[in-house]
């Protein structure tokens, strides 16, 4: 381990309209391809920047929804959000135990696969953890995609970089099938994150932090930040303030989670109907 990096504070679930890559502790992370010209992406901002700037061969990020993929795209590196449970989340600051995971980021698919290989494994301290075989870089030395079918949303086909990638895949033997993205409204997505973080963060504080810290709950954190908002929360803390008032029963939570899973599975129907590998 070479070191830690500066990330978007509280996994970018702390404030509204605040810049990606900012934390009160580390300040503003900058994109090495254009400081203050291009965004860093987030929330794993420093992980993407560190790899792009050659500070490290690879880095680890965490993702609930987009926090590995976003900074990977913004910094031109390869990022992977693994299946939840394949990598232990023990010790990770949570947004959502339903959706959180750690994941690898590197400059190439091979390096990302090698790091993924090193990260997977069962951990009894993570209730979602399962034993996954570390075989992620096997077969990457071959260039053929013969017999494989890949789907692409029609709206992305006109992007010049996507076109280049699709042409390379076709040359390697892949079949590319374009389709219109399903129209899915994830109305309860923020509600799910709110419920999970309201429940999961106090558990993390109790289990994994210094016992001398002056807070045990999200409300304590909000009040602590108010003591010096210019230092601790210069862009506000709207999300955390909202979380203080979240009060939903376990039955409502389970119903919300089931609804989200049902909507997500609509994408699997498309994959099955078009006979796609990915």
Q: Language-model segments: what does each one mean?
A:
Residues 175-189:
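Short connector loops at secondary-structure junctions
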Residues 52, 117-124, 170-174, 194, ...:
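Sec-exported extracytoplasmic/periplasmic mature domains
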Residues 81-165:
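A short helix-breaking turn/cap at a secondary-structure junction
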Residues 16-23, 187-200:
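Charged, often glycine-rich, active-site loop that binds/positions anionic groups
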Residues 1-2, 54-58, 108, 148, ...:
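Loop/turn elements at helix/coil->beta-strand transitions in domains of secreted/extracellular proteins
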Residues 4, 56, 119, 161-162, ...:
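Glycine-rich, small-residue loops and helix-cap segments
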Residues 144-151, 195-263:
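Short helix-loop capping/hinge segments that flank enzyme active sites or metal/cofactor-binding pockets
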Residues 1-102, 127:
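Short glycine/serine-rich loop/turn segments
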């Amino acid at each position: 381990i070479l070191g830690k990096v500066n990330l978007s504070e509280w996994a970018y679930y702390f404030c509204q309209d605040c810049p990606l890559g900012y934390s009160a502790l580390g300040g503003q992370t900058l994109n090495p391809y254009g400081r203050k010209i291009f965004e860093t992406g987030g929330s794993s901002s420093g992980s993407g920047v560190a790899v792009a700037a050659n500070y490290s061969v690879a880095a680890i990020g965490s993702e609930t929804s987009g926090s590995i993929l976003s900074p990977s795209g913004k910094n031109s590196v390869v990022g992977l959000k693994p299946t939840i449970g394949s990598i232990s989340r023990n010790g990770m600051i949570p947004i959502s135990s339903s959706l959180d995971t750690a994941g690898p980021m590197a400059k190439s698919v091979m390096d990302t696969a090698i790091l993924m290989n090193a990260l997977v494994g069962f951990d009894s301290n993570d209730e979602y953890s399962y034993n996954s075989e570390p075989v992620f870089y096997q077969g990457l030395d071959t260039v053929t995609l013969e017999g494989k079918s890949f789907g692409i949303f029609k709206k992305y086909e006109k992007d010049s970089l996507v076109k280049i990638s699709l042409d390379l895949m076709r040359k390697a033997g892949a079949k590319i099938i374009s389709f219109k993205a399903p129209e899915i409204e994830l109305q309860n997505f923020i509600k799910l994150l709110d419920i999970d973080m309201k429940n999961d963060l106090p558990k993390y504080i109790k289990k994994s932090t210094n016992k001398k810290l002056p807070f045990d709950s999200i409300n304590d954190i909000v009040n602590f930040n108010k003591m010096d908002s210019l230092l601790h929360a210069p862009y506000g803390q709207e999300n955390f303030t909202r979380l203080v008032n979240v009060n939903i029963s376990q039955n409502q939570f389970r119903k919300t989670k089931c609804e989200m899973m049902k909507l997500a599975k609509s994408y699997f129907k498309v994959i099955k109907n078009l006979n796609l590998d990915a």
